[in-house]
Design a protein with these regions (language model features):
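Catalytic-core regions of core metabolic enzymes
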Residues: 1-627
Length: 627
């Protein structure tokens, strides 16, 4: 089922609507009645009217509605969702909290909610959600204080409070949104569903998100990878630290997961990652309004030397390049600018430049074929107003079709000019580094959207019974990590592993090594020795190594160790050996310095032999049980 009617409903029912001051039910009703183009139906069995609208007792009396917003207590919410499903309502937003974020009882309640929603194939947002905003139909189905301005950014967040803060800030900046979704606990709909929906929406130019965790990593990567071919996705992913992950778990019940895995997965999906809120929206403004650069070479044009140097440093910090102008460009700038100006990049038109001199320099810099983007930096001067310069920048950017970011280093004097630039889709900032980072976001999206990715490897020959058996045996021994059985585990997942075997005598080691096609490596099998090379407990040799016939031992802090001269290994073939402690009595004693150059090492702490050949080919289930 698509999400079209979630974002463009004609009739919305509010279950739990009320006139009680300070209540969520009243806030949702007031927000819907303020701008919503459709019809709002209050549902409350205990009153006849809410805010001048006649109420109905339950969803069986609402007639056809496209969306039900649920603001009743959690003990009642599941029955309301069930009734919505029975009445054929496609979309439900559960604002009610008290589910998976509250502990085991709430988690059980959330599982039941999910089961009900899935039974009726409902598009369910939440629970524990602020609600949903769709500016295309003027719908504010939230209990937040602000309606979003109309725009082309779609935004999802696991934090409802963050949405209220963002809307307050964005309204002041004049930044608009297409859709805004408070994901809540993501019992049914999650980031994958909204990424897909907004990827298909021609009115969404950029997708932004604040996430504490991603439930189905592979599915999200697949969905995002398809969308980011055309539509940029920028995320702030929190819970990066141990303390942050713990806080995320208490906030929405989210398991934050491995930071390294998120970094790799988001990169594979073509998702841009912002470190903070400012960077999130700086990137969004550039991506929503500017073309992509054809090269990484940036031209900086400024009327102030110091800020120009700041911008130049930021170019290098971002991994971009300062454009090297052609001789024709340098000649042209030399004619347009006074001798005291700097015609090389960064171009300094100096502080007495009027709008005509600035315009000529911008035009010439953007005309250079090596320039992929430009950053215009200006400080307040008496001979030039920011409004005059903003009009020139809008004109030249449209003429050349190259991305431009602007740094107007002023306060109130720059506000009107910034509004002019923002209306034209040109980002404007006070800090030169922010302007350059916005250009870097364009470069990053250009590269990620055109990058070819290998499809994820799929292993059809997976034996879950073998994996379960290996792990259960290790758990039965009280072990928290596995040793050589790791190769069996990888093999059970269909992952190729080197050939080899576990042996318990020099003769067996020699026999296995000689049967391996290629060089051989031998290592100790002992749960007490993690870094075997530190104590000489591993060795390698080529196939041409002569096989000695004697056995020696030596003592160290790890106890007596059996040394068996043998061939050893290599890059892709291995032979492991383990000798029980009882066999060491027949060995002679030697110092570590007398250990032969090529030997296998077996820790005396191995009181039994590992019989599982860890590098062997896949065995059948019956063969494993027969061993």
């Amino acid at each position: 089922m698509g999400l079209e009617t979630l974002f463009a409903p004609e009739r919305v029912a509010v279950v739990g609507a009320t006139e009680r001051d300070g209540s969520v039910g009243r806030a949702v009703m007031e927000n819907l009645l303020s701008e919503f183009a459709g019809e709002t139906v209050p549902v409350n069995p205990n009153t006849d009217a809410v805010l001048g609208l006649e109420t109905v007792p339950d969803l069986t009396r609402t007639g056809d509605v496209d969306l039900a917003v649920v603001v009743v207590p959690p003990s009642v919410a599941i029955d309301v969702v069930r009734q919505a499903g029975e009445e054929g309502i496609e979309n439900v937003v559960v604002i009610t909290a008290g589910f998976g974020e509250t502990g085991s009882e709430g988690a059980a309640r959330e599982r039941e909610l999910r089961e009900v929603a899935e039974r009726y194939d409902l598009n369910l947002v939440g629970p524990n959600s602020l609600g949903v905003i769709a500016t295309g139909v003027g719908m504010n189905a939230t209990f937040g204080p602000d309606m979003a301005l109309d725009g082309d950014i779609s935004f999802m967040s696991q934090s409802g409070a963050f949405i209220t803060a963002v809307l307050d800030w964005a309204n002041d900046r004049g930044i608009g949104f297409r859709d805004v979704v408070s994901l809540g606990n993501k019992a049914v709909l999650d980031e994958r569903d909204f990424v897909r929906a907004w990827g298909d929406d021609p009115d969404t130019d950029v997708v932004l998100g604040y996430l504490e965790g991603i439930g189905e990593g592979r599915a999200f990567i697949d969905a995002a990878r398809e969308v980011t071919q055309d539509t940029p996705i920028v995320l702030v992913k929190s819970g990066r630290t141990e303390a942050g992950a713990h806080a995320a778990a208490s906030h929405t019940g989210t398991i934050a997961g491995s930071e390294a895995a998120y970094e790799a997965g988001l990169d594979q999906a073509g998702v841009l990652r912002a470190e903070n809120v400012q960077e999130l929206f700086d990137s969004a403004e550039a991506l929503a309004g500017q073309p992509l650069p054809e090269s990484d070479d940036v031209a900086v044009v400024t009327n102030a030397g110091g800020p120009g140097v700041m911008a130049t440093d930021a170019v290098g910090d971002a991994g971009l390049s300062l454009a090297s102008f052609s001789q024709a460009t340098l000649d042209q700038l030399g004619e347009e600018l006074p001798e005291t100006a700097n015609i090389y990049n960064p171009v300094d038109v100096i502080g007495d430049a009027d709008v005509d001199r600035f315009a000529a320099a911008i035009d010439t810099a953007l005309s250079d074929p090596t320039v992929g983007a430009a950053c215009i930096v200006s400080c307040p001067v008496a001979v030039l107003t920011f409004e005059e310069l903003a009009a020139v920048i809008v004109e030249k950017q449209a003429e050349h079709g190259k991305p431009v970011a602007v740094c107007f280093m002023g306060g109130d004097s720059a506000r009107e000019a910034q509004e002019t630039l923002n209306a034209a889709g040109i980002p404007a900032y006070f800090d030169p580094a922010r302007a350059i980072r916005s250009l870097d976001a364009l470069r990053e999206f250009r590269d990620s959207s055109t990058r070819e990715y290998d499809p994820a490897a799929e292993y059809d020959d997976v034996d879950p019974d073998a994996v379960r058996e290996i792990l259960q045996e290790a758990a039965g021994r009280g072990e928290t990590r596995i040793g050589v059985e790791a190769m069996d585990l990888l093999s059970a997942y269909g992952i190729p592993v080197p050939d080899g075997a576990v042996v318990d005598s020099p003769d067996d080691a020699r026999e296995v090594a000689e049967s391996i096609d290629g060089d051989v490596v031998m290592k100790v099998v002992s749960p007490d020795i993690l870094h075997k090379s530190d104590i000489g407990a591993s060795a390698s040799a080529s196939r041409t190594t002569r096989w000695p016939r004697r056995t020696t031992t030596w003592s160290s802090a790890h106890g007596p160790t059996s040394l068996t001269p043998t061939s050893s290994a290599c890059r892709s073939r291995s032979c492991w050996t383990s000798t029980p402690a009882s066999r060491l009595s027949s060995a002679s004693t030697a110092t570590r310095s007398s250990v032969p150059s090529y030997c296998s090492v077996s820790g005396a702490s191995s009181s039994k032999c590992w019989r599982t050949p860890p590098f062997a080919s896949r065995r059948s289930r019956s063969e494993r049980r027969a061993r």
